[in-house]
Amino acid sequence: MKGLRLGVNIDHVATLRNARGVRYPDPVAAAAIAEQAGADGITIHLREDRRHITDRDVAMLKQTLNVPMNLEMAVTEEMLDIAIKTQPTYSCLVPEKRQELTTEGGLNVAGQLETITDATRRLSDAGIQVSLFIDADHEQIDAAKKAGAPIVELHTGQYAEAETEEQRTVELARLMEASEYAHSIGLQVNVGHGLHYHNTLEVAEIPQVCELNIGHSIIARAVLVGLDQAVRDMRNILDKAR
């Protein structure tokens, strides 16, 4: 069985920098450390309000990364233009509301199929591999397939936020079933959102999962143990799963 890919999201390095309006810590430096520690890719979310990652960060990372860039973005003309100009390896289309602290749910592909299909086609024509961040739901998985995206990233937030063991078991089973279904219709399965050092192993053990995108928990741990160690610790969890 292939090894799992770890995508390290460095958004919150930029959050820390922007909290004081200074130039440090530098997301570009953080990405280099994460690469050396075992990250298979670097994920960044260029939000419409630029609350953490900036256009300059995107441009600098494109020049310096030695691993694939996964650019998360809303489905807007501005973001499509930036992605096509930047040429990340992957572009993950996500829903976005300005008032939310973090992405709260999956993209409603079924409800805006024409728009998502058009965005997917434009990005694909530019040589960018498209993933759609969706809930673990058959309707959305089917819509992602119809839209022409080769990859889905299943939203693990409900699993991560489960307050009881029973609820967590139900959510894990839902992720397992959705992963199996998406894989069966020819989609690559990635997962992400809310994953940390105590809940990632079970998700990583789902056979169809290829990549986990994890950010906040790694950056939070980095404050205590350093970024290199924080990434290595998560890498070890993924390696244990396979």
UniProtKB/Swiss-Prot annotation:
Domain of life: Bacteria
Enzyme class at the top of the EC tree: transferase
Keyword line: Cytoplasm, Pyridoxine biosynthesis, Transferase
Gene Ontology cellular-component terms listed: cytosol
Location relative to the cell: Cytoplasm
Associated pathway: Cofactor biosynthesis; pyridoxine 5'-phosphate biosynthesis; pyridoxine 5'-phosphate from D-erythrose 4-phosphate: step 5/5
Residues flagged as site, Transition state stabilizer: 153
Substrates-to-products reaction catalysed: 3-amino-2-oxopropyl phosphate + 1-deoxy-D-xylulose 5-phosphate = pyridoxine 5'-phosphate + phosphate + 2 H2O + H(+)
InterPro entries: Aldolase_TIM, PyrdxlP_synth_PdxJ, Pyridoxine-5'_phos_synth
Residues binding 1-deoxy-D-xylulose 5-phosphate: 11-12, 47, 52, 102
Binding site for 3-amino-2-oxopropyl phosphate: 9, 20, 194, 215-216
Pfam families xref list: PdxJ
Residues forming the catalytic site: 45 (proton acceptor), 72 (proton acceptor), 193 (proton donor)
Entry's EC annotation: 2.6.99.2
Gene Ontology biological process: pyridoxine biosynthetic process
Transferase keyword on record: yes
Function summary: Catalyzes the complicated ring closure reaction between the two acyclic compounds 1-deoxy-D-xylulose-5-phosphate (DXP) and 3-amino-2-oxopropyl phosphate (1-amino-acetone-3-phosphate or AAP) to form pyridoxine 5'-phosphate (PNP) and inorganic phosphate.
Stated family: Belongs to the PNP synthase family.
PANTHER family found in the cross-reference section: PYRIDOXINE 5'-PHOSPHATE SYNTHASE
Protein name from the UniProt record: Pyridoxine 5'-phosphate synthase
Source species: Idiomarina loihiensis (strain ATCC BAA-735 / DSM 15497 / L2-TR)
Gene responsible for this protein: pdxJ
